[in-house]
Amino acid sequence: MALDVDVDSLVIGGGIVGMSVAYGLARKGDRVVVLDGVDDAYRASRGNFGLVWVQNKGLTRPGYARWTMRAAQNWAALATELYDLTGVDVELQQPGGLTMSFDEGLLTTASKKLDALGEELGIRYPYERMNVTELKSLTPDIGPDVVGAIYCPLDGHVSPLRTLRALTQALISLKGELVPGVNVTKIEHRGNEFVVHSNKKAFFAKRVVLTAGLGNKVLGEMVGLNVPVRPQRGQILVTERLRPFLKHPCHYVRQTGEGIVQIGDSKEEVGFDDATTLAELSRIAARAIRCFPVLKDVNVVRTWGGLRVMTPDGYPIYEESKQYPGAYVVTCHSGITLAPVHAGPLVEWMHKGSQPQEIQSFTSERFNV
């Protein structure tokens, strides 16, 4: 057995959510170790679409809308900070995002929902309803079936893989450590610290943060936390490089800086099956072609399936264990969008005990009603 390790904060889960929290903790001066799973673990970060997305978030929970806006407004600062520390460009672009519509009635419904959310927030919600003429001024290549779109100036996208690399390198630059291939078998609370047993060694920490995605369900039980998460499959198509035609990312189509186009936004309840299916890939491809006919004859170079981490109501869980104070769970399905607030105000809560107002209702207790 290797020597035990004693740290300030132990983060279990090395995806986007975990590395954002770990980086934030290291930035506060903690000695941080991140335990990451084995190579065949289900990883939402590897299948991420890369959107920094605000519109339509929090329609039934205004606090989440505020939290998401706060994150998007701080993404540029985080991207700059990561570049200065690591030299890794996460390829952030925030030109505003588009949700295309093929139906005027649905477009009207979407507008009314955003207006109502703005009233609840006490603001004019940051969006524009665009007709076809206005939309073509932004995106000339739309198809004839598109009747308009919702545009939100806060939306954008990043490279998920570059973001994960930048966060990891930033953590290491702040004397943090990432330990791969770890299977946590038991978490104990002894006195003022936690003992985390694994297949490699025992880790001692004053604070334990569970960010293991779908693995949080089992890990949470070890520290008195209820984490009712389930997998939801999403499938993605990646095309060959194309001429730049899509400056503004859409909810299910985006073009990267290299010119490739990603097509996605499928939602399937199929358990832990992360395979791709011809039927679903065909459906999302047809929708993308309907939006942008230029995609009709392009070559697809890659497809993959990934598993989102979903709670019963689709919103995050941010909670400290009442039974074992110092043990936290952080779980969500918008790890890219929320990275700045996970590295910032969420870490402030863990250090100072004052939870951000926007997320005070996001404990698992809401599922007991």
Q: Where are the regions that the model predicts?
A:
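Glycine-rich FAD pyrophosphate-binding loop
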Residues: 26-48
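Central helical "cap/lid" subdomain
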Residues: 42, 198-245
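Dinucleotide-binding Rossmann-like beta1-alpha1 core, especially the glycine-rich loop
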Residues: 50-134, 138, 287-289
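Helix-loop-beta segment of a Rossmann-like dinucleotide-binding subdomain
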Residues: 87-101, 126-174, 266-270, 325, ...
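Helical element adjacent to the flavin cofactor pocket in flavoenzyme catalytic cores
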Residues: 150-206, 215
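Active-site lid/adjacent beta-loop-alpha segment flanking the redox-cofactor pocket in flavoenzymes
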Residues: 240-327
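C-terminal catalytic lobe of FAD-dependent flavoproteins
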Residues: 292-369
